[in-house]
From Swiss-Prot:
Heme binds at residue 445. This is Steroid 17-alpha-hydroxylase/17,20 lyase. Its cofactor is heme. Belongs to the cytochrome P450 family. GO terms for cellular component: membrane. SUPFAM superfamilies: Cytochrome P450. It comes from Gallus gallus. Pathway: Lipid metabolism; steroid biosynthesis. Keywords: Heme, Iron, Lipid metabolism, Lyase, Membrane, Metal-binding, Monooxygenase, Oxidoreductase, Steroidogenesis.
Length: 508
């Protein structure tokens, strides 16, 4: 028998054994959750095939299998979480038990074998690495005046572009991407770029290539042995990562050569400083050494996730403002009353603009940027609710389902910022335990504070000056997203009309 046939037969027998092993009590007591039908080798893939909007497919399957159910991705046992009660148990109550990450071909390529924060295995080294990242962000980053100035600088540049193109149908996506990219580049590398800069264009190209290929859920992540065959998507991913790594290495080398410890210019300097401090303060325990690769992949995490996610949330916000002009008008009225036109918005204005804050929160709820959170892995035999979960199970939290639970949200598909306001009109940060836009617990998003700063300042600056409208000759753009690494917005154009009040202020 040919070697490949032997391998396939062995895999089929292994899957059949695992499937039979997994059966038993599946709906009550201490048994596992009910599972989708599964076949040897392929598992439950046939149940998911033909459904590109995976988050919606998993959301609807709970009508048949309950809010917590299992399925098989090839030989991998996966538990799907659709309720906030189970989500909070996984993320908070039993965060350490579910702190693992799956090792896949794609994530190993993205993180150089798990040397980053997002995909690394949970353990002493990961905890030490995350602690240093928090220290670096505190040293240069989250909430700092310097970072606010950077965001305001890019917001002003964005407004200049909109002003030059006012009354024209404009695709805002490239401009939003440039603005957010410059914020993250300034944070990480102390550099920013003008439109058309070759290095900037290379960043955009490799970032989009990574997003496009990872979004396709390559079969090699389910069946790693498929790597022996030609794979166009995997080849493209490797080419994009080669460009990414060359750019990161160039920046890192420049920083190491210039680093003196007296001046911290950016996050990369801060990471070098906190690593040096940790090494000088006490001898590191064996296995806790952070290599240059760890620092590079950490910066790569912040850059990659920080650009794509925040840009996507901004695009969704603009899209919903086109669909709900009354919301946009109310934000502008609030800004006119509380801030006026004589000065620019600042982060300190957030308590003065509760309706803008509520609008941002509602956008994060109704279109979660990551409808399926990065999968967790159970590090020991454990449970979720009344159900047993074996060690090594992959746990997928369907944030779309959590944010559209009719038991928690009245008319969840309706865009209503008012659900994030109290009776006095003040912003409620979390009106329901079913609100988890950045995850929670041990694996909570590192960029939450930065993202909230950017969302507030970019929207405040733009709406103080412009009214965003759909071009008259075009229909309102679709609110249907495209599932992928992020919930992507379909392309649309917008007309940024200079507000009469702001025009008058400019004349004065």
């Amino acid at each position: 028998m040919p070697p490949l046939a032997v391998l396939l037969l062995a895999l089929a027998l292994l899957c059949a054994w695992r499937l039979s092993y997994s059966q038993g009590p599946t709906g009550t007591g201490t048994g596992r959750p009910r599972s989708l039908p599964a076949l040897p080798l392929v598992g439950s893939l046939l149940q998911l095939a033909g459904h590109p909007q995976l988050h919606l497919r998993l959301w609807r399957l709970q009508g048949r299998y309950g809010s917590l159910y299992g399925l098989w991705m090839g030989s991998h046992y996966v538990v799907v979480v659709n309720s906030y009660q189970h989500a909070r148990e996984v993320l908070l109550k039993k965060g350490k038990a579910f702190a693992g990450r799956p090792r896949t071909v794609t994530t190993d390529l993205l993180s150089r074998g798990g040397k980053d924060i997002a995909f690394a295995s949970y353990g002493p080294l990961w905890k030490f690495q995350r602690k240093l990242v928090h220290a670096a962000l505190s040293m240069f980053g989250e909430g700092s005046v310097a970072l606010e100035k950077i965001i305001c600088r890019e917001a002003a540049s964005l407004c200049e572009t909109l002003g030059a193109a006012q009354d024209m149908a404009l695709d805002m996506a490239p401009e939003l991407t440039r603005a957010v990219t410059n914020v993250v580049c300034s944070l990480c590398f102390n550099s920013s770029y003008r439109r058309g800069d070759p290095e900037f264009e290379a960043m955009l190209e490799y970032s989009q290539g990574i997003v496009d290929t990872v979004a396709k859920e390559s079969l090699v992540d389910i069946f790693p042995w498929l790597q022996i065959f030609p794979n166009r998507d995997l080849a493209l991913l490797k080419r994009c990562l080669k460009v990414r790594d060359q750019l990161l290495q160039q920046k890192f080398t420049e920083h190491k050569e210039a680093f003196c410890g007296d001046t911290v210019r950016d996050l990369m300097d801060a990471l070098l400083q906190v690593r040096l401090n940790a090494e000088n303060n006490s001898p590191l325990e064996p296995g806790l050494e952070l290599t240059d690769d760890h620092l590079l992949m950490t910066v790569g995490d912040i850059f990659g996730a920080g650009v794509e996610t925040t840009t996507t949330v901004l695009k969704w916000a603009v899209l919903y403002l086109l669909h709900y002009p009354e919301v946009q008008k109310k934000i502008q009225e609030e800004m006119d009353q509380k801030i006026g036109l004589a000065r620019h918005p600042h982060l300190s204005d957030r308590p003065l603009l509760p309706y803008l804050e509520a609008t941002i929160s509602e956008g994060l709820r109704i279109r979660p940027v990551s409808p399926l959170l990065i999968p967790h892995v159970s590090l020991a035999d454990t449970s979720i609710g009344e159900y047993s979960i074996p060690k090594g199970a992959r746990v997928v939290i369907n944030l779309w389902s959590v944010h559209h639970d009719e038991k928690e949200w009245d008319k969840p598909e309706e865009f209503n910022p008012g659900r994030f306001l109290d009776e006095q009109g003040q912003h409620i940060h979390s009106p329901s335990p079913s609100y988890l836009p950045f995850g929670a617990g041990i694996r909570v998003c590192l960029g939450e504070v930065l993202a909230k700063m950017e969302l507030f300042l970019f929207l405040a600056w733009v709406l103080q000056r412009f009214t965003l409208e759909c071009p008259q000759d075009q229909p309102l753009p679709s609110l249907e997203g495209k599932f992928g690494v992020v919930l992507q917005v379909q392309k649309f154009r917008v007309k940024a009309r200079l507000r009469e009040a702001w025009r008058g202020e400019m004349v004065r």
